[in-house]
């Protein structure tokens, strides 16, 4: 399949100083998977597989993967980075800037949550973060000058200038989940524009992760679009999906085609509950495929906004054959992890 001499590549793989491998291929190309699988079997070093189409549109997702990979191999907070506001009052902030919402958590020295906020991100990550932080401060009757350290995470993390450090949502979700339940070993996070599964060890460190960011299928955006098509709120969709009678299959892997399939089912006079069940099963199937790829085991925790969708949770639990741990702070998990890292600065 490769038409070039691979002698140099083989020599590189045998280099005793090799620490890790980043394997880059063209997006949606199936041919390279054979070589990747071979290298995965032969090498003991950590490996990260990246797929791109050489455009800048996917730069955010690629940056997240690369940074999370690097964070998994070294201490996230270096001693040289520790720079607290010495005039602060022992208050630590985590800001999770996502595609749909921006979440803020403020912790005190005892790791208690003193303020928490979830607001729509809006058109700009930086402006959305400022609004959410100001609201969190207002609710706790605090000022920015009283804050000791701030860590940002999420896809908009690098656009937020008020943070002392940015850390990927992969690492922050791992920290937040382990803090909430030290027995958790596999984390399922379904957000607005991607879904991810993270494996952690008995110290809470990331050992492996996979992300589905090729398209919106199986994400919160997918469910929002389908709810709009069915003229339902997400809350109604969550409840109605549990009352299904007919087991309908949504076969399309693409969000656009899935919407057309839903419109066709509506025309066939299928009930909304049955259609929603089919959508939930579709999301669960995509999620469980990620779990299989990462080798999910141990106790499972689900985080992100989709964890509030009872139908999706039920479908994932049935397919995995396990009970998912879902915290009251599930949607704030990334911000919580960021705030915990802020305490180390």
Predicted stretch roles:
Residues 220-223, 314, 327-345:
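Glycine-rich phosphate-binding/hydrolytic loop that grips phosphoryl groups
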Residues 258-291, 331:
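Adenine-nucleotide phosphate-binding core of ATP-dependent small-molecule kinases
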Residues 87-169, 308, 317-318, 322-327:
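N-terminal glycine/serine-rich phosphate-binding loop of ATP-dependent small-molecule kinases
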Residues 83-88, 139, 155-208, 288, ...:
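Conserved phosphate-binding catalytic cores of ATP/NTP-utilizing and phosphoryl-transfer enzymes
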Residues 124-125, 202-246, 340:
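Glycine-rich phosphate-binding loop plus the immediately following alpha-helix
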Residues 155, 295-319, 330-334:
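Glycine-rich phosphate-binding loops at beta-strand->alpha-helix junctions
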Residues 120-121, 149, 165-174, 188-192, ...:
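Active-site nucleophile and cofactor-binding loops and adjacent substrate-binding regions
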Residues 1-92, 110, 215-223:
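An N-terminal assembly and electron-transfer interface module characteristic of large anaerobic redox
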């Amino acid at each position: 399949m490769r038409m070039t001499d691979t002698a140099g590549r083989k020599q590189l793989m045998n280099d005793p100083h090799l620490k890790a491998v980043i394997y880059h291929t063209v997006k949606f190309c199936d041919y390279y998977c054979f070589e990747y699988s071979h290298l995965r079997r032969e090498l003991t070093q950590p490996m990260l597989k990246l797929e791109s189409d050489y455009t800048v549109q996917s730069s955010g997702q690629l940056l997240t993967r690369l940074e999370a990979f690097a964070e998994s191999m070294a201490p996230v907070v270096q001693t040289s980075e520790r720079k607290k506001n010495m005039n602060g009052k022992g208050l630590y902030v985590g800001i999770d800037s996502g595609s749909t919402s921006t979440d803020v958590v403020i912790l005190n020295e005892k790791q208690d949550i003193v303020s928490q906020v979830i607001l729509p991100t809006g058109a700009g990550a930086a402006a959305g973060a400022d609004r959410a932080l100001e609201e969190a401060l207002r609710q706790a009757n605090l000022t920015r000058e009283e804050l000791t350290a701030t860590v940002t995470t999420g896809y908009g993390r690098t656009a937020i200038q008020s943070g002392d450090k940015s850390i990927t949502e992969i690492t922050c979700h791992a920290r937040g989940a382990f803090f909430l339940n030290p027995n958790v070993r596999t984390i399922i996070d379904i957000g607005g524009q991607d879904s991810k599964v993270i494996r952690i060890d008995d110290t809470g460190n990331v050992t492996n992760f996979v992300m589905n960011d090729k398209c919106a299928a199986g994400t919160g955006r997918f469910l929002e679009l389908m709810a709009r098509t069915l003229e339902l709120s997400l809350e109604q969709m969550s409840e109605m999906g549990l009352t299904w009678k007919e087991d309908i299959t949504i076969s399309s892997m693409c969000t656009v085609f899935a919407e057309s399939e839903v419109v066709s089912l509506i025309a066939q006079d299928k009930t909304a509950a049955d259609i929603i069940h089919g959508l939930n099963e579709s999301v669960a199937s995509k999620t469980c495929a990620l779990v299989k790829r990462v080798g999910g085991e141990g106790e499972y925790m689900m985080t992100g906004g989709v964890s509030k969708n009872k139908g999706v949770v039920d479908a994932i639990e049935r397919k995995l054959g396990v009970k998912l741990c879902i915290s009251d702070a599930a949607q704030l998990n990334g911000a919580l992890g960021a705030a915990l890292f802020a305490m180390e600065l």
